[in-house]
Amino acid sequence: MALLKPFLSRTFSSFFATITGGRNLIDSIEELITTNYWLIFVMIIVCTCSAPSNGAFFLNDPYGYPFVSLQDDSIESVSATTITTTTIISTIITTTTATQRIFQEKAKTFGQSAEEIQKVKYYLEKIQKFEAKQHPEEIRQQHTTKNSEAIKDDLQIAVEVAKFEKRQKDSITLNPEENGQYYEGDIVLDAQQAHEIYESMIQHGRRTKRKFIRSELRRWDSHKPIIYSFDGSHTIREQRVIELALEHWHNITCLNFERRDDEIQENRIVFTDVDGCASNVGRHPLGEPQFVSLAPECIRLGVIAHEVAHALGFWHEQSRPDRDNYVTVRWENIDRDSKGQFLKELPTDVDNGDVPYDYGSIMHYRSKAFGRYEDLFTLNTNIMDYQKTIGQRDQLSFNDIRLMNVIYCSDSCAQKLPCQRGGYTDPRRCGRCRCPDGFTGKLCERIMPGFGADCGGRIELTSSWKRITSPNYPRDFKEGQECSWLLVAPPGQRVQLRFYGEFEMYCKVRHSLCMDYIEIRNSTDFANTGMRYCCYGTPKSSIMSATEDMLVLFRSFYRGGKGFQAQVRALPTTVFNIRTVRSMDEFNANLNKHAVADS
């Protein structure tokens, strides 16, 4: 072992120097093979022995299409049997062309002139100063994790700053688009958009934008392929991951994408690596390229899907005019220069397609976005148990997809099917319904079978307790397993669920975000993302359904663990205790009741 130590030390030093020394993947691999062939040999043996035989990193698509999991951020190759290759017209060009060099030059300023950049900067500074005056509260340590304490003096502030800087890398890795220098972190405004937001803010105290851009000039023509190009700044592997995200958008909407790297005419999306994760919003109204910047830390399918959504016309979820009914902005905890990132839209200028507010949207900020310190909550969900739902970047939510289809694909199918459980006619396959997670079948009439485990199903309840658990409980479940239960009470009764025993589901404790989770949908609309439970403490309160049904989803995307067990039963409405209810319908009913009383 003593003889091996110097050799291993030199080998690993050479290995990391090669990897970190440049962006050219092919050259790096060639150098590694020629100079570190013993290490490569050992790595091949180890990887061959340890690779899962069932392809565990390929997850089940809840929407019925084969695609690589949005959780997997390290895809090197894709099986032809797993990914359809005909959905996107793509011609890969491995050398930088003259056209790509033109795109690279334009991408440095996102296609804007120096005058336009100065105008945007001017209005953003105005917005920042206005919001700082509107919310001058000093920092207070409220609604933080249990280990957080109030900041008492300069010494403790210094400690917090040190901790914050130490955690920056982890924060950027989690939701890198929130750490950008642009509007709301990752939105590159043009001069007209910046002016409109500022004027609206001065007049109304909020911005005039919406979850989806209203202007027809900025919408893409859904009857033609959306042209996209690469400017040559991404590796072949990075290009393929980006195309997988486009392929996912293709599969779940009526939109088609076509790659053309060899011309500069026509509106198009150009993928570049110029500055973090960032995008313009919607199509350029004058036919110029619409740039999407994806740095190496952004090459994750969930983050790419988020940025492509901006390019197609999406703004952020928590900026909707009805957001105060669902989240509370902790202005006192927001970084002083970032308060303009939490502006709200006008209710008279909204295009949300009648799609309700979605805690699980891939466009939603996480709980601690733009905090002055990382332990400070900047967004609190008004129903506490949704706190770990917001901010996910794993996959597009059902309502994200539904809104995109409402905007672009409403005329794709001649007939609308009588879909159940909140589903709607699939614009890509008009003979079937697109179903919420947990349901399947032509009309969403069946509960989705377990994936990777024999679990889930429909359970008819009585007044006696029944038990449901994660696979293999009390032993560990495995990564990639999924279970869906539909709990059904007799007519006129409700479903009660309570957790007990050991509970362990992987989460980002510091960021208050579930990675693996048990999700409970207990409202009247199963299309809405439910409350997600995770981390390492057993939830205490009982959960009641708003109707006779409750949907329970177990999803293990990242790693195995102990899991959960829960008791379920039916209860008459006369036994119903309002304090145990956690339901969007009950919450909205209370909001309406208070609104009537106040008026």
From Swiss-Prot:
Gene3D superfamilies: Collagenase (Catalytic Domain), Spermadhesin, CUB domain
InterPro entries on file: Astacin-like_dom, CUB_dom, EGF-like_dom, MetalloPept_cat_dom_sf, Metallopeptidase_nem, Peptidase_M12A, Peptidase_Metallo, Sperma_CUB_dom_sf
Free-text comment on the cofactor: Binds 1 zinc ion per subunit.
Residues annotated as binding Zn(2+): 306, 310, 316
Every Peptidase M12A domain range: 211-410
Cellular component aspect of the GO annotation: extracellular region
Main location: secreted
One record GO biological process: proteolysis
Gene (UniProt): dpy-31
Domain CUB: 455-571
Bridged cysteine pairs (disulfide): 254-409, 277-298, 413-433, 435-444, 455-483
Domain of life: Eukaryota
Keyword terms of this UniProt record: Cleavage on pair of basic residues, Disulfide bond, EGF-like domain, Glycoprotein, Hydrolase, Metal-binding, Metalloprotease, Protease, Secreted, Signal, Zinc, Zymogen
Signal peptide: 1-22
The keyword Signal appears for this protein: yes
Lineage: Eukaryota, Metazoa, Ecdysozoa, Nematoda, Chromadorea
GO molecular function: metalloendopeptidase activity; zinc ion binding
Protein name (record): Zinc metalloproteinase dpy-31
Every EGF-like domain range: 405-445
Cofactor: Zn(2+)
